[in-house]
């Protein structure tokens, strides 16, 4: 069954720039009623909202400054968004970083932000609490399906997002909240441009850059187009990949009992 984006209210964390901004733009282009952008960067956030307003109309996008690693502030801001927009239909937990040097920040943002954002979405949208249900999209990465040894903490954080989402989707019948996971491949964003500077000192940054240069890069628009399709077509619990500037595809995890090996 096709999920209609038209007239839906949306929250995007980390939406001031990069892929998050493109999510907001593409959803508005597909008829979303309004998009709330949460981001730590106030000036870029305000600029992004102004640009979206010029393209789609006044009040189609609203900016809320928020550090999603601050659990108290995040909850307060989420409540403010809910009250300002008179509810939410879609929550995209996109805020993240790629910084293995500051591994505590990476875990707080990539893991903690997604977990709290998901729990807040279920608390407010969940049918078990009087809500009408909705959709959560958690942003993982293709590294959540494999490994990238140069960025150990980033990989671990995205594997966490994947496992968390796969657990949470089991409560759809009770909450009415669909849980989807998007796994972008290598995408042209500021995070990728600085990854060589964010690795641990035992990792050769030149080798990291050499590997990145050898891989196909996709524009942020390709991931955003995939996001629209995921929200429209994705069944609860589905995991989609958007990479190599190609159309998205879904993946399934095998049953471990079917791939066990003798030892």
Give the positions of each predicted feature:
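Canonical Rossmann dinucleotide-binding motif of NAD(H)/NADP(H)-dependent dehydrogenases/reductases
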Residues: 2-36
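Residue(s) in the substrate-gating loop at a strand-loop-helix junction
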Residues: 141
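Active-site-adjacent segment of SDR/Rossmann-fold oxidoreductases
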Residues: 30, 125, 129, 146, ...
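Conserved glycine-rich Rossmann-like NAD(P)H-binding loop of the short-chain dehydrogenase/reductase
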Residues: 32-48
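Substrate-binding pocket helix/loop in short-chain dehydrogenase/reductase
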Residues: 102-107
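C-terminal helical subdomain
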Residues: 181, 200-255
């Amino acid at each position: 069954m096709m999920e209609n984006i038209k007239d839906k209210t949306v929250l995007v964390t980390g939406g001031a720039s990069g892929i998050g901004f493109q999510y907001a733009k593409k959803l508005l282009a597909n008829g979303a009623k309004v998009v709330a952008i949460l981001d730590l960067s106030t000036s870029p956030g305000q600029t992004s909202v102004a640009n979206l307003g010029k393209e789609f109309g006044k009040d189609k996008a609203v900016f809320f400054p928020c550090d999603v690693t601050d659990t108290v502030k995040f909850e307060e801001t989420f409540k403010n968004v809910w009250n300002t927009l008179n509810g939410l239909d879609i929550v995209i937990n996109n805020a993240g970083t790629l910084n293995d040097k500051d591994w505590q920040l990476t875990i707080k943002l990539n893991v903690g932000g997604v977990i709290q954002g998901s729990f807040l979405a279920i608390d407010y949208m969940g049918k078990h609490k009087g809500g009408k249900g909705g959709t959560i999209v958690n942003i993982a990465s293709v590294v959540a399906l494999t490994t990238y040894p140069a960025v150990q903490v980033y990989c671990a954080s995205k594997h966490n997002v994947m496992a968390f989402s796969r657990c949470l989707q089991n409560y759809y019948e009770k909450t009415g909240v669909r849980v989807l996971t998007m796994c972008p491949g290598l995408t042209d964003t500021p995070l990728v441009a600085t990854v060589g500077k964010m690795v641990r000192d035992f990792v050769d940054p030149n080798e990291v850059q050499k590997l990145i240069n050898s891989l196909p890069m996709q524009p942020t628009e390709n991931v955003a187009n995939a996001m629209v399709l995921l929200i429209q077509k994705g069944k609860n619990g589905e995991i989609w990949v958007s990479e190599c500037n190609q159309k998205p595809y879904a993946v399934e995890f095998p049953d471990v009992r079917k791939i066990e090996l003798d030892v």
